[in-house]
């Protein structure tokens, strides 16, 4: 018979061996129960799902439909109901994203030459460019030029004065005076800055007369259409009219471009130039020019 101490050691060894067996069996059972939950669809399963989505128009299947589809697809591989549900959800999201991407590409406007020309024409104004191609600055407020200012404004088909050897001559016996580049309403700013002009007309049907013109130069911007209208002489009596308005009655201006005569034509250095108009049937419109 063994002593009690030896019995206690045997019992302790049996307990340790039992614990080791239980741990091994437990660990082995855990590894056997651990399975992969990721679904790997087969080709037949994907084909059937796409037929249901596109041909049968099934976008969000119900619970009964999911069970039936799962039972049908299980014949071709391992699958669960949640795999069917998530496949429809993901496929529907991809379709929405694809439509959105295609829609943004289709709605993007293409920059065609016609649209570019139309955009350029919207910002182009003929009064802001002179014939040398140098752009002029647009005024702060758009100026609406009224061309129908009674009968005093000239039509574009009438002859305009031209410079020949320093003299300003009229092509015909009209009464236009000092209208330079009137087709666009503005004088080009590249010729000695801004210039202003005025003219005096002396209508003589009987004898000669003197026309006085004082020279005053200004550097303010000038628009020919802002000036007052010239008046025409009537009934054969002598009248002295000017192209300026009431504000220019005392100060009449001419173009400060080129000198026409020597110093002997200047009366006393006062800036006034006198010219004798011969007695003719047509009116005498004289316009003298000086450098600034």
From Swiss-Prot:
Gene3D superfamilies: Homeodomain-like
GO BP terms, alphabetized: anther development; axillary shoot meristem initiation; cell differentiation; regulation of DNA-templated transcription; stem cell population maintenance; stomium development
Compartments, as annotated in UniProt: Nucleus
Disordered, as annotated region: 1-40
InterPro entries from the UniProt entry: HD, Homeodomain-like_sf, WUSCHEL-like
DNA-binding region: 34-99
Basic residues: compositionally biased ranges: 1-11
Impact noted for substituting residue 41 to L: In wus-3; weak allele in which meristem stem cells are misspecified and appear to undergo differentiation
UniProtKB keywords: Activator, Developmental protein, Differentiation, DNA-binding, Flowering, Homeobox, Nucleus, Oogenesis, Transcription, Transcription regulation
Top-level lineage group: Eukaryota
Pfam families found in the cross-reference section: Homeodomain
Expression by tissue: In the active shoot meristem, it is specifically expressed in a small cell group underneath the presume position of stem cells. Also expressed in the floral meristem. Expressed in the nucellus of ovule primordia.
SMART domains: HOX (SM00389)
Induction annotation: Repressed by the CLV (CLV1, CLV2 and CLV3) proteins, possibly to rapidly down-regulate WUS expression in apical daughter cells after cell divisions, suggesting the existence of a feedback loop. Repressed by AG at the end of floral development. Down-regulated by ULT1, probably to establish floral meristem determinacy.
Record-annotated disulphide pairs: none
One term under GO cellular component: nucleus
Function: Transcription factor that plays a central role during early embryogenesis, oogenesis and flowering, probably by regulating expression of specific genes. Required to specify stem cell identity in meristems, such as shoot apical meristem (SAM). May induce shoot stem cells activity in order to maintain the stem cell identity. Involved in the developmental root meristem. In shoot apices, it is sufficient to induce the expression of CLV3, a putative ligand of the CLV signaling pathway.
Known partners and oligomeric status: Interacts with TPL and TPR4. Interacts with BZIP30.
Similarity comment: Belongs to the WUS homeobox family.
Full protein name: Protein WUSCHEL
Organism lineage string: Eukaryota, Viridiplantae, Streptophyta, Embryophyta, Tracheophyta
């Amino acid at each position: 018979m063994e002593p009690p101490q030896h019995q206690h050691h045997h019992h302790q060894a049996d307990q340790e061996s039992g614990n080791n067996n239980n741990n091994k069996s437990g660990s082995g059972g855990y590894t056997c129960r651990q399975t992969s939950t990721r679904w790997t669809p087969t080709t037949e399963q994907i084909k059937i799902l796409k037929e249901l989505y596109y041909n049968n128009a099934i976008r969000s299947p119900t619970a009964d439909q999911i069970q039936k589809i799962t039972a049908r697809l299980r014949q071709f591989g391992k699958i669960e109901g949640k795999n069917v549900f998530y496949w429809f959800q993901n496929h529907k999201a991809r379709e929405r994203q694809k439509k959105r991407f295609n829609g943004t590409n289709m709605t993007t406007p293409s920059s065609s030459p016609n649209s570019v020309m139309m955009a350029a024409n919207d910002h182009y104004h003929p009064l802001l460019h002179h014939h040398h191609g140098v752009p002029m600055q647009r005024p702060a407020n758009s100026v609406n030029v009224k061309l129908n200012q009674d009968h005093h404004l000239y039509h574009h088909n009438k002859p305009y004065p031209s410079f020949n050897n320093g003299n300003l001559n009229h092509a015909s016996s009209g009464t236009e005076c000092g209208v330079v580049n009137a087709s666009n309403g503005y004088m080009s700013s590249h010729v000695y800055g801004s210039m202003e002009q005025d003219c005096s007309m002396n209508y003589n049907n009987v004898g000669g007369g003197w026309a006085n013109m004082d020279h005053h130069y200004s550097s303010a911007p000038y628009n020919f259409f802002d000036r007052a209208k010239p008046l025409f002489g009537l009934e054969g009596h002598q009248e002295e009219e000017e192209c300026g308005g009431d504000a220019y009655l005392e100060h009449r201006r001419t173009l400060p471009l080129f000198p026409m005569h020597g110093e002997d034509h200047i009366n006393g250095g006062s800036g006034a130039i006198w010219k004798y108009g011969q007695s003719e049937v047509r009116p005498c419109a004289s316009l003298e020019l000086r450098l600034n």
